[in-house]
Amino acid sequence: EMQRSLVGSEMCIRDSYAGLCECRDCEYVLIHDGARPFVTEEILKRGLQKVKETGACVIGMPSKDTVKLSDEEGYVKETPNRKCVWTIQTPQIFSYSLIREAHDSIRQKDMSKITDDAMVVEQETGAKVALAEGSYQNIKITTPEDLDIAEAFLKH
């Protein structure tokens, strides 16, 4: 049951912490990016089932593309095995105690390279974060092209 929602700011990690401070009396916390309007009830159910088993879960999909890691000079440094590469979506779901511990730990550190809440949990607690399948339609709308894709989803 959702107790309350908060409007975001410029830095999502600070927003997550603000949300954690508002919902102290809960067992699990679901952190969702408002730029992903196509999250489904089925995705939520899979994520909640996984977090109950593991304590930390991110939604995502196996990458359909080959991914290259680059060096600082713009050359390919490494090509990870595609079978091990997932593109991560939201929601990200955690036990309240775990995500709160992670955020409390990082508060006084440089957060400029933090990309999501799972990264905070990984770095600050060492906890494993499980993967749960999302949907290729659970896209993040950040560019005009994304909006075109979203409109196409709505037409079908």
Identify the residue ranges that each predicted region occupies:
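Single conserved hydrophobic/aromatic residue that forms the stacking wall/gate
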Residues: 1-8, 12-13
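Short secondary-structure boundary/capping segments
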Residues: 3-4, 20-21, 48-49, 76-78, ...
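A residue-level structural signature of the nucleotidyltransferase/glycosyltransferase Rossmann-like core
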Residues: 4, 36, 56-58, 77, ...
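A general structural signal for well-ordered alpha-helical segments in protein cores
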Residues: 13-16, 31, 44, 60, ...
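Conserved beta-loop-beta/alpha segment of the NTase-like Rossmann-fold superfamily
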Residues: 14-72, 89
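Residues that scaffold the ATP/ADP-binding catalytic core of kinase and kinase-like folds
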Residues: 27, 69-70, 79, 102, ...
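Short, flexible, basic/aromatic active-site loop/helix in glycosyltransferases
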Residues: 68-94
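Conserved alpha/beta core of the MobA/IspD/sugar-nucleotide pyrophosphorylase nucleotidyltransferase superfamily
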Residues: 85-156
